[in-house]
């Protein structure tokens, strides 16, 4: 999932006592699951869950059913779309969600532009401001609708202040 494209560190300090990149962090959990004998199904869509905990799914193997003692629903996450954020207009060229920008840069080695502004001061927004700067882009500013930054103080320092990227609060 999303951890593959998070090549920056900052994961795992609480759980593993060291700072890891997204792929390293994910691999730790994969290793733990394998060691515990946990079977995982990827590229699989659950299409039914009965009261008796019979799970019906579709995968490359076809239609499969599992009888479970317990079911843990892990739906994953998705970025909110431009429409969900009430950003008006059509799908303009050069406007990316942070996840899409991160995938282009970190997984596909494609730069999304030479100048950028970031809307939102969450951790991923600040990390992307730094990443774009490291890749040679000019990040003019990070804009935050709230009167305070929503990311961690360390990211304000390491991603914005250290690179001279201004943060404008109460702005959109």
Over which residues does each language-model region extend?
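Residues forming the flavin
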Residues: 1-172
């Amino acid at each position: 999932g999303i951890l593959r494209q998070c090549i920056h560190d900052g994961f795992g300090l609480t759980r593993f006592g060291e700072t890891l990149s997204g792929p390293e962090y994910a691999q730790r959990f994969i290793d733990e699951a394998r060691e515990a004998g946990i079977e995982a199904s990827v590229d699989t869509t659950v299409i039914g869950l009965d009261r008796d905990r019979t799970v019906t799914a579709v995968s490359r193997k076809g239609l499969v059913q599992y009888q479970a003692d317990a079911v843990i629903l892990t739906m994953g996450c998705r970025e909110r779309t431009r429409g969900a954020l009430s950003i008006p207009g059509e799908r303009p060229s050069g406007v990316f969600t942070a996840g899409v920008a991160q995938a282009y840069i970190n997984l596909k080695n494609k730069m999304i532009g030479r100048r950028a502004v970031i809307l939102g001061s969450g951790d991923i927004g600040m990390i992307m401001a730094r990443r774009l700067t490291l890749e040679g882009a000019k990040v003019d500013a990070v804009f935050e609708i709230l009167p305070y930054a929503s990311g961690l103080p360390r990211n304000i320092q390491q991603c914005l202040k250290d690179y001279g990227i201004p943060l404008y609060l109460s702005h959109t």
